[in-house]
Amino acid sequence: DIYFGTAHRGRLTLLSTVLGMPYRGILSKFQGNSNDPNEVLGSGDVKYHLGVSSDREFDGKKIHLSLTPNPSHLEAVDPVVAGKVRAKQTILNDKTTDKVFGILIHGDAAMAGQGIVAETFAMSQLRGFRTGGTIHFVINNQIGFTTTPHYGRSAPYCTEIAKMVQAPIFHVNGDDPEAVVHVCRLAAEYRNLFKEDVVVDMFCYRRSGHNEADEPMFTQPLMYKKIKQHPTTLNLYKDQLVKEEVLSEEEAKTKISDFKKFLDNELILRKKNK
């Protein structure tokens, strides 16, 4: 079993690509539809708080995945995930901690700014709370809403707090997908071997605003001028694959076009997913 805890950024992608939630199901939620209309007396919660569990198969092996629901209070989900992992390990009598573990996905500003992160690390090695290590993944977009790093923390890196338990910290470039995958595999192997926390700090950027209403050119004009001129990770990786002759330019364009058509079709089918 793997238990996930994350905030808003990247949550919908996690739901679809990792937990296998159909895109039409996610889009249906944006239409205000509910699995059970009688379950709430109101309009419900934002979609970025949605929790889902699923059973998936990877490399011929079945695994249970669970994304814990969370409130808008960043990082509040951290000890909840750790507690769920510990509880499931107890139920399964998983003394080796090989069967169940947790993955926490943080934002850079919240990682450094929210005290609950430090509290979760502080409890991670205690006999009554340890889980055999949590994998921490930081989506480091180098901004917290409108706060830049040098106004948000005193340390050079947002991950400094992890040093309190001597957790190894891997800094990786988000524009290099293969490097990110390599480091994540390394982090997973470290956790499984040494049964301790490990951190992956992925340096990237936030291409749009903090939310649907935020226009970052008002508060960070210089930063966002550079971001607008910077090619997307998709295009950078596509160009790399074409250069390495893994696929042709035409094949790449076809794959991108086919996926957009797939999403358009899911948007149509969402109406049936009420």
Task: Label each residue range with its predicted role.
Residues 144-155, 163-199, 203-209, 217:
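Conserved phosphate-handling catalytic cores of large alpha/beta enzymes
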Residues 1-116, 121-135, 140-150, 154, ...:
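Conserved internal helical-beta-strand scaffold that buttresses enzyme catalytic cores
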Residues 220-227:
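A ubiquitous short alpha-helical element
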